[in-house]
Amino acid sequence: LAEDLVPAQIAAPGAAAPPAGRPVSALLRQPAFAVAMLGAALGYGVMNLLMAATPLAMQVCGFGFDSAALVLEWHVIGMFAPGFFTGHLIKRMGTLPVMLLGVLLNLACVGIALSGQEIAHFTAALFLLGVGWNFLFTGSTTLAITAYRPEEKDRAQGAINFFVFATMAGTSLASGA
């Protein structure tokens, strides 16, 4: 039985075909791709920075674990509940306006977070942060797929993911968490 499963000879690998499509440097020279990559990184970076720091800030302000958990629950609702209609907003308003709305919601989040230290401030700020992340990331993803060819999908997604998660690593360190 084992002889039937293992080939008698294994063929030597041939020369690998060159990867299809343009290099990442060529993709980055396209404004749509660059904006998509920056939008995704901005959305994730701001979200990660503030989300990671909020439980620590709440603890310093005298709030317990239950309060921090409630705030993070509202943040997660803000991140994912808009997913039911963000695509419709993009179709109706366009990709860039939805991304801009995400940036404005992130700025509103920062304004609310800086305006007070009550549970309502933390909750409203992180809820808006979640919605802003959704609009930025969904918009960025929608924009990105217009900027590369099908054969470049893996390379393009890899470049975007690398930039996004490198940004997240930096904001994790910057958050103090």
Please report, for each region that a protein language model flagged, where it lies by residue.
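Juxtamembrane intracellular "pre-TM" segments in multi-pass secondary transporters
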Residues: 4-36
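Helix-to-loop junctions at the C-terminal end of transmembrane segments
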Residues: 82-95
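Pair of pore-lining "gating" transmembrane helices in MFS-fold secondary transporters
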Residues: 29-47, 127
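Intracellular juxtamembrane helix-capping segments at the cytosolic ends
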Residues: 135-148
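Short amphipathic helix-loop junctions that connect adjacent transmembrane helices
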Residues: 52-69
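A late C-terminal transmembrane helix in Major Facilitator Superfamily
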Residues: 152-177
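Structural signature of the two symmetry-related core transmembrane helices
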Residues: 97-111
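Paired small-residue
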Residues: 109, 120-128
